[in-house]
C-alpha cells in the first residue's frame, strides 16, 4: 500500500509539473516585441480614456457656463434703461396709478343694442 500511495503521489506531482510547465510556457509564449507592444497599447488606451473624459467634462462645462452667462445677460438687459423696457414699465405703472386714484369715479355703464329685435327687456 505504501508503494501505491507513493506511486499516486509521484504521478500527481508529475502531472502537476507537466501541466504547470505547459501552461506557463503557453502564457509566456510571446516575444519581447509583442509584450512591449501590448504594454504600449494598454497605456495608450488608458490615457485616451482620461483625455476623452477631460474633453467631455470641458464641453459640458462650457455649455453650462454659456447658458448661465446668457441668462444673466438677458436678465440684466430686462432691467436696463432701454427705451422699449422703459415704455412698458412707465405705461403699466401709469395705468394702475390712474385706476387706483380714480376708483370712486368708476361707474357701471349699460349699452343697449336698439337694433336687436325679438328680445324684450323685462322691467
From Swiss-Prot:
Compartments, as annotated in UniProt: Cell membrane; Apical cell membrane
Single GO BP term: ventricular cardiac muscle cell action potential
Membrane topology type: Single-pass type I membrane protein; Single-pass membrane protein
Broad class of the protein's primary localization: membrane
Residue stretches spanning the membrane: 49-69
Gene Ontology molecular function, alphabetical: potassium channel regulator activity; voltage-gated potassium channel activity
Listed InterPro entries: K_chnl_KCNE, K_chnl_volt-dep_bsu_KCNE2
Protein name: Potassium voltage-gated channel subfamily E member 2
Amino acid at each position: 500500500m505504501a508503494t501505491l500511495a507513493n506511486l499516486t503521489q509521484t504521478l500527481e506531482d508529475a502531472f502537476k509539473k507537466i501541466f504547470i510547465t505547459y501552461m506557463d510556457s503557453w502564457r509566456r509564449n510571446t516575444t519581447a516585441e509583442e509584450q512591449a507592444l501590448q504594454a504600449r497599447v494598454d497605456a495608450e488606451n488608458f490615457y485616451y480614456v482620461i483625455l476623452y473624459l477631460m474633453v467631455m467634462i470641458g464641453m459640458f462645462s462650457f455649455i453650462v457656463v454659456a447658458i448661465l452667462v446668457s441668462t444673466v445677460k438677458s436678465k440684466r438687459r430686462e432691467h436696463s434703461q432701454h427705451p422699449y423696457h422703459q415704455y412698458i414699465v412707465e405705461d403699466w405703472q401709469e395705468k394702475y396709478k390712474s385706476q387706483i386714484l380714480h376708483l370712486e369715479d368708476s361707474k357701471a355703464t349699460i349699452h343697449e343694442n336698439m337694433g336687436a329685435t325679438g328680445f324684450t327687456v323685462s322691467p
